Design a protein with these regions (language model features):
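Short, surface-exposed amphipathic charged segments that create phosphate/polyanion-binding patches used
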Residues: 195-199, 236-250
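Phosphate-handling DNA/RNA-contact segment within nucleic-acid enzymes
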Residues: 97-198, 212-213
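RNase H-like polynucleotidyl transferase catalytic core
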Residues: 180-186, 223-234
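Single conserved hydrophobic/aromatic residue that forms the stacking wall/gate
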Residues: 1-8, 12-14
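Acidic beta-strand-to-loop metal/phosphate-binding motif
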Residues: 167, 197-208, 212, 227-230
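A residue-level signal for conserved active-site and pocket-lining positions in enzyme catalytic cores
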Residues: 76, 124, 201, 238
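TOPRIM metal-binding catalytic domain and adjacent DNA-binding surface shared by DnaG-type primases
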Residues: 18-115, 123, 257-275
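Short, aromatic/basic amphipathic alpha-helical patches
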Residues: 210-221
């Protein structure tokens, strides 16, 4: 009877947390899962280069392969990430172990799970991967490059440079806009692949962030298109806009209505900035 009572109390507590705070519920589930998760299998030793795709992702399960109740899948569902990308995102319960497998002795702090976002080049070859924290671990994003000569650009394997190209800051934001890549927090050099007026930059909505404002001015100076968020925008980024209930079509309409270039972009940016 005591065991049944404890199980009943746990169910009530789970339901309460889920009802009051869905985000906290996802983090709470993840914490419970971590305690009961089996240890990561020992890596197989062979003589092939450590950079090969299979040694990095082969031991990981994609989000698509996880049970619907798995905390990592619940997190992705909660962020409203389109299901077409579930097989392109992975769960890693020991991120530090994964990093040290390809770059020994890089990660020495306390290990924890992360969402793995792989970066592929235009030929489909893996050249980097990003770990996104589920909880409050810092930094929130950690990107590991396997090829130091390549820029940290996400989404190159599916972008069409003959069409209008959108560029966001974060990889997750790029999943909600067609033909979109992410600069992953770095200044992107497009190497003349595409006319400047065929490129639209979308930064996070942070008018008080000096670094972002500086980069926005740089985009305008290079004659790229720039999205300048309206004054009544209360969401921080594209993912927040989608989570609020906005559809992809409505998002595209919002972006198009707030896209500027040259003098009009400069005028709007001067009004937008709060620094």
């Amino acid at each position: 009877h005591g065991l049944l009572r404890r199980q009943r109390q746990m169910c009530i507590r789970d339901s309460f947390i889920k009802y009051v705070d869905p985000k906290m519920y996802s983090e709470y589930l993840l914490e419970r899962y971590k305690k009961s998760a089996p240890a990561t299998p020992r890596p197989k030793f062979d003589f092939k280069p450590a950079f090969e795709d299979r040694t990095i992702l082969d031991d990981l399960k994609s989000i698509k392969q996880l049970d619907d109740e798995h905390p990592a899948k619940q997190y992705v569902i909660g962020r409203k990430i389109p299901s077409e990308f579930y097989d392109k995102l992975f769960f890693c319960d020991k991120f530090g172990q994964l990093v040290n497998k390809v770059k020994p002795n890089t990660y020495k702090t306390k290990d924890h799970p992360r969402l793995i976002i792989p970066f592929y080049d235009t030929t489909g070859k893996l050249f980097a991967f990003q770990g996104r924290a589920f909880g409050n671990e810092q930094p929130k994003y950690l990107t590991i490059k396997l090829d130091e000569n390549k820029q940290k650009v996400y989404g190159l394997e599916r972008v069409n440079f003959q069409r209008q190209v959108y560029i966001t800051e974060g990889p997750i934001d790029s999943l909600f806009v067609d033909n979109c890549i992410a600069a992953a927090g770095a200044d992107l050099v497009l190497k003349n692949k595409i006319p400047n007026d065929q490129v639209t930059y979308i930064f996070d909505n942070e008018p008080r962030n000096r670094e972002i404002i500086k980069r926005m001015y740089s985009v305008v100076e290079k004659d790229y298109n720039l999205v300048v968020w309206p004054d009544d925008m209360r969401h921080k980024d594209i993912n927040d806009i989608i989570i609020s209930g906005t559809s992809k079509a409505e998002l595209l309409d919002l972006l198009n209505k707030n896209t500027y270039s040259k003098l009009s972009a400069l005028t709007k940016l001067n009004e937008y900035k709060k620094v």
